[in-house]
Swiss-Prot record:
EC number: 5.3.1.1
Residues at the active site: 94, 166
Keyword Isomerase applies: yes
Main location: cytoplasm
Listed name of the protein: Triosephosphate isomerase
Gene that specifies this protein: tpiA
This protein's record includes keyword Protein biosynthesis: no
Source organism per UniProt: Thermus thermophilus (strain ATCC 27634 / DSM 579 / HB8)
Subcellular location: Cytoplasm
Record keywords: Cytoplasm, Gluconeogenesis, Glycolysis, Isomerase
Family designation: Belongs to the triosephosphate isomerase family.
Top-tier EC class: isomerase
Amino acid sequence: MRRVLVAGNWKMHKTPSEARVWFAELKRLLPPLQSEAAVLPAFPILPVAKEVLAETQVGYGAQDVSAHKEGAYTGEVSARMLSDLGCRYAIVGHSERRRYHGETDALVAEKAKRLLEEGITPILCVGEPLEVREKGEAVPYTLRQLRGSLEGVEPPGPEALVIAYEPVWAIGTGKNATPEDAEAMHQAIRKALSERYGEAFASRVRILYGGSVNPKNFADLLSMPNVDGGLVGGASLELESFLALLRIAG
């Protein structure tokens, strides 16, 4: 049985002082959870997350990581640093990193390796732009991305890897794939994982949907057998909507 994960990607929003208030309110209002919750804020907020969320059911993590272990790499943040801050997760391969920073599948794979070396679970993002979907090539495009981003990546177990399918055309647009569209892609991803790591492994890897997830569509998405949670953007910034997602997840 795969445990539902609701992971909030805050992107470049909130200051550390704003986050402190948000975390304190979350801590006060958090219902008992059967599912798993995580918040992924900007790097400067992570020490605040460590301080406020340490003894709660809410995990936290980063939105990116360096592909390098350490050294003269100005502006980079290593997996070891994230581990020292208590991060449970880190996103790699988000479409905004691929688009605006030119990140390749090979670079994403190196980042995933660095995280696994430090015991941090990568949330590895894959997904197609609109023009690819309109050509009917969404599945082969996404699976090529998945295979390239997992090249040489050997998680110690299925719980050590999370995949997030994020159709690029649905991110921040208010559009979202239908539950049936999401399920079809998640099935294809799980099949590719089975070919790469074996069926027993693939059956236990969580595959999240990311793309304008909100309290209105989340229950329908979760009703699909291969949708194991959400990588949530805008709806994770408002405490009320994030709590609503957690209540839906159970």
